[in-house]
Amino acid sequence: MKKKQTKVKQTVKLVLRNPLSISWPIVDANTQEKLAQTLVQWLPASHKDILDSKLTVGLNSVNELLERCCQNAKDVTQPAVVFILHDQDSMLVTHMPQLVANANFYGSSKCRLVPLGFSAQALIAKKLGLSRAGAIAVQDDSPLWKYLKDLVMNIEEPQARWLSENPEYEVTKVEKIITSQKENQGTKKEGKNEKGNEFKK
């Protein structure tokens, strides 16, 4: 008696890799946890103290600060670090790596970008006496900076190399992702990405 064969269906998906996109900095879970704990411990608990502590709190406020850093870098003090309290794939913050990279290009100092995830937001917002806190920017003359500096200095700041005076040509790559699915079981396996095809002018 012949053994029943399982049919495997393969699907090919093409993914465009934009060479001009800026990736989120890589921050390990242990560092994220330490930074979240440090913020909960040392953040002020009143609105007046937030202003006195050289902090900018709230996603819209941090957005506006970084935009001013790009537009008028000489007159606006760039933050030393920006903490994002949303998950990286949230549409609310997908622009943040690019925005910080732009501010780093135009500014005289460098700003780190640290994603802490949405799970850290509740405790941090509670400490600040707020209902939510999507982002926090910390100046290097803030009282908090001395507690954060050693933890964030090894995190690479976002940079847009293509904004430099002599940018290198970056090819656009299309990666081929092959997935396989057993038709009789409905289970799906992700295959490895194949080397991308390069499209040049």
UniProtKB/Swiss-Prot annotation:
One biological process term in Gene Ontology: intronic box C/D snoRNA processing
UniProt main location, coarse: cytoplasm
GO CC terms of this entry: cytosol; nucleolar ribonuclease P complex; nucleus; ribonuclease MRP complex
Cellular compartments annotated: Cytoplasm; Nucleus
Alphabetically ordered keywords of this record: Cytoplasm, Nucleus, rRNA processing, tRNA processing
Subunit description: Component of nuclear RNase P and RNase MRP complexes.
Sequence similarity: Belongs to the POP3 family.
Function noted in UniProt: Required for processing of 5.8S rRNA (short form) at site A3 and for 5'- and 3'-processing of pre-tRNA.
Entry protein name: Ribonucleases P/MRP protein subunit pop3
